[in-house]
């Protein structure tokens, strides 16, 4: 089972992330559980730390085998997740990162930069 967790700065992208992730992994036999945030208007606003706690609880309990999370840069989500037990989270911004992280580090969580290249000319 794959858990999707979004923090508040990127909550508005949850639907797109869930749809794309599910579309790729479900044909391979994986199930994606969406733990939110579901939109920027959610009553409960999840912070990096809360996402890290949730990732740790899901992985430690066996409710999830893998967690996909992220934030604007992916760095804050990665640091928060790695602060809690039983989470080995890598920063993944491209397919090569994902492959090497899985092969070399045997992690159980990835943090993605959901706002990367979103400001175009400013980069």
Residue ranges and their predicted role:
Residues 1-8, 32-37:
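Generic N-terminal amphipathic, Lys/Arg-enriched alpha-helix
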Residues 3-19, 98-123:
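C-terminal binding/interaction regions
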Residues 56, 70-71, 93-97:
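Catalytic alpha/beta core domains of metabolic enzymes, predominantly
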């Amino acid at each position: 089972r794959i858990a999707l967790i979004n923090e508040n700065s990127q909550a508005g992208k949850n639907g797109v992330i869930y749809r794309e992730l599910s579309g790729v992994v479900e044909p391979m036999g994986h199930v994606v559980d969406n733990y939110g945030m579901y939109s920027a208007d959610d009553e409960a606003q999840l912070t990096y730390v809360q996402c890290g706690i949730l990732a740790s609880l899901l992985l430690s309990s066996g409710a999830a085998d893998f967690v996909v999370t992220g934030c604007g840069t992916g760095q804050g989500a990665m640091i928060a997740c790695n602060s809690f037990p039983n989470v080995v989270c890598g920063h993944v911004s491209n397919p090569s990162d994902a492959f090497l992280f899985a092969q070399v580090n045997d992690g159980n969580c990835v943090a993605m930069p959901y706002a990367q290249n979103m400001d175009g000319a400013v980069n």
